[in-house]
């Protein structure tokens, strides 16, 4: 006998998804997405009801998106959410207009940037106010390589990452003995220097006019020009960044970074190579900024100094702080919120940034640890009592 609660639960999630997406997608497209979410939830229910039903559900297109070890690697509680999320991310864009797709592609781009800064600020505790400089390195590096030497986007991705990582190593070596306010001041000076160079080195960067006609990504004869192309591109890069950061966070290097963040002197006394790991943190975080910079240049086919300012660094830092310094899901949520919410408030154009800023201040006042706290769900029941 079918449990009515199990039938209505998927429908409820579908309705919730539809209502939340109406401001972005419109009623008709939101209804389509709600149906896709409800279908994914129903298939998940079927997957837990007998051998025949499991076989039917597993042959569906939805479950094929995350088949294999992805299903067995997650807990029973997270499985349905992962499935619904995968279907929504993969199929949802087909029902969205170009404006919404462009906003979401930008959101995924900022997810990559926020995850990179999280390595430096969240994992290692090194306050970097000049992170947008590495973003600029990747973008300008690829723009110059593309326009002057005809380098393709796919070759430019690792080149941009390496260039930004090299600059990260340089900054890490210079700031080895600095922490806190002093480190913040030096990194602030770094972004200002980079911005001045980009604005005034006309023979290379074309000054404030920027660089035009940057090569777009291309697969065979398919040139990425539509917003949906860049949605899937940035989503793919963001997923790779999430997976790598998750593995790194739980690795020996990740634990050593967090030991440095908590108490650098104690970590060094315990044999942690703090010097090498701090430089590695700068390089790793910068590499993700370089990748994001290449994606940015390929998406817009144009770069200019005004895209890489100190304000950009602050926005990325706000994403990390809002989401939760050590929480990867929190940083992802923080990045998406900070990109998407101002667009939702365009109806009150004159006050949208005021409303958004007030909401951020309120959020950080009532929940200073961020939207998501790492490890909260893993605490044992008796931990609180103890």
Segments from the language model and where they lie:
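Transmembrane alpha-helices and adjacent helix-loop boundaries
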Residues: 2-386
């Amino acid at each position: 006998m079918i449990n009515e609660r199990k039938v209505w639960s998927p429908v409820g999630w579908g309705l919730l998804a539809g209502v939340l997406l109406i401001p972005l997608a419109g009623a008709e497209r939101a209804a389509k997405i709600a149906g896709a979410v409800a279908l994914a939830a129903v298939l998940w229910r079927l997957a837990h009801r007998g051998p025949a039903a499991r076989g039917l559900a597993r042959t569906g297109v939805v479950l094929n998106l995350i088949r294999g070890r992805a299903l067995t690697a997650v807990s029973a509680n997270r499985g349905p959410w992962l499935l619904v999320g995968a279907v929504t991310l993969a199929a949802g864009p087909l029902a969205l207009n170009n404006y919404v797709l462009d906003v979401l592609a930008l959101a995924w781009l900022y997810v990559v940037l926020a995850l990179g800064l999280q390595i430096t600020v969240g994992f290692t505790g090194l306050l970097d106010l000049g992170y947008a400089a590495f973003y600029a390195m990747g973008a300008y590096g690829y723009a110059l390589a593309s326009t002057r030497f005809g380098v393709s986007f796919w070759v430019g991705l690792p080149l941009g990452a390496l260039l930004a990582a090299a600059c990260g190593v340089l900054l890490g070596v210079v700031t080895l003995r600095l922490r806190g306010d002093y480190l913040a001041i030096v990194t602030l000076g770094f972004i200002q220097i980079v911005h001045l160079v980009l604005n005034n080195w006309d023979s290379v960067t074309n000054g404030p006019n920027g660089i035009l006609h940057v090569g777009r990504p291309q697969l065979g004869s398919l040139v990425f020009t539509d917003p949906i192309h860049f949605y899937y591109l940035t989503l793919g890069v963001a997923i790779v960044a999430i997976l790598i950061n998750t593995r790194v966070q739980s690795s020996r290097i990740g634990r050593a970074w967090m030991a440095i963040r908590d108490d650098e002197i104690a970590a060094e006394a315990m044999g942690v190579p703090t010097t090498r790991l701090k430089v590695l943190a700068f390089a790793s975080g910068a590499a993700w900024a370089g990748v994001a910079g290449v994606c940015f240049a390929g998406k817009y086919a144009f770069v200019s100094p005004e895209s890489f300012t100190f304000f950009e660094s602050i926005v990325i830092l706000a994403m990390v702080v809002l989401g939760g310094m050590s929480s990867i899901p929190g940083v992802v949520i923080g990045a998406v919120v900070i990109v998407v919410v101002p667009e939702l408030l365009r109806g009150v154009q004159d006050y949208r940034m005021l409303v958004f800023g007030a909401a951020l201040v309120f959020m950080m006042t009532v929940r200073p640890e961020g939207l998501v706290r790492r490890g909260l769900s893993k605490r044992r029941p008796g931990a609180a009592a103890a």
